Curated annotation (Swiss-Prot):
GO terms for cellular component: endoplasmic reticulum membrane. It is found in: Endoplasmic reticulum. Belongs to the SelWTH family. SELT subfamily. Disulfide bonds join C92-C95. This is Thioredoxin reductase-like selenoprotein T homolog selt-1.1. It catalyses: [thioredoxin]-dithiol + NADP(+) = [thioredoxin]-disulfide + NADPH + H(+). PANTHER family: SELENOPROTEIN T, THIOREDOXIN REDUCTASE-LIKE SELENOPROTEIN T. It comes from Caenorhabditis elegans. InterPro entries: Selenoprotein_Rdx-typ (IPR011893), Selenoprotein_T (IPR019389), Thioredoxin-like_sf (IPR036249).
Length: 247
């Protein structure tokens, strides 16, 4: 095999190993820091404001934009609130919802600095996680067979399948196809689309049930309402903020 072929095998093997480790980490440890989608994809999911309203410019490509300070009044931080329940958010890492979690965490901390907040990956059902991991190893094995020109079927007296002959004759295109299709199937298996919010032991929002992520104002109103139910709402606190009309 030429040096170029060895180099390509090494690159694809390394990419496959990274993909396997990423999937295992997301399902076993329930904490990931990958898969941040582009800003436009996030705005299509979370941007529920009209086009006529002004927004600030993001400092990073994956930044979730919020209203300008001149048209949005943030609430006063409630520093004296004690013994607050833990806010837990379980989100789909592979869907790119990590940035949504970070943004909503900021909103909650601005009003309730003493509120403990936790976030974790919302894992798919167990059988889907196992199938996705198995597909990662199968994909890696197929890439090695194709790039190495190996025919394992001969050892079992099964000859030389036509599809394998075609793959050996078109190694680069075949490997690209296997890699992309494998990733597509894996992502479809581990993607849950979840953004589930719990305050204490009570669930206050479910994207799986509602089909959408709450707006920042809804998010804070849900927290305020649940704190009131628990008898932990501070007295005379303002809501998340008010949108002011600009002339």
């Amino acid at each position: 095999m030429s040096r170029f072929g060895v180099f390509i095998i090494g690159v694809l093997f390394f990419m496959s190993v990274c993909d396997v480790l990423r999937t295992v980490s997301a399902e076993e440890h329930s904490h990931d820091e990958n898969h941040v989608h582009e800003k436009d994809d996030f705005e299509a999911e979370f941007g529920d404001e009209t086009d006529s309203q002004s927004f600030s410019q993001g400092t990073e490509e994956d930044h979730i934009e919020v209203r300008e300070q001149s048209s949005f009044v943030k609430p006063t931080a409630v520093h004296h609130a004690k013994d607050l329940p833990t806010l837990r958010i379980f989100y789909c890492v592979s869907c790119g919802y990590k940035q949504a979690f970070d943004q909503f965490t900021t909103f909650a901390k601005e009003k309730y600095p003493n509120m403990p907040i936790e976030g974790a990956n919302f894992a798919p059902v167990l059988w889907k996680a196992y199938v996705a991991q198995a597909l990662s190893f199968v994909k890696m094995a197929v890439l090695v067979l194709v790039l190495g020109g190996i025919n394992p079927f001969e050892r079992f007296g099964l000859g030389y399948p036509q599809i394998l002959q075609h793959a050996h004759g078109n190694k680069m295109s075949s490997c690209m196809l296997v890699f992309m299709l494998g990733n597509l199937v894996e992502q479809s298996l581990i993607s849950t689309g979840a953004f589930e919010v719990y305050l204490g032991n009570e669930q206050i929002w479910s994207k799986i049930e509602s089909g959408r992520v709450p707006s920042p104002q809804e998010f804070m109103q849900l927290i305020d309402a649940q704190l009131a139910v628990l008898g932990k709402a501070p007295v005379n606190t303002e809501s998340f903020g008010e949108f002011q009309q600009t002339v």
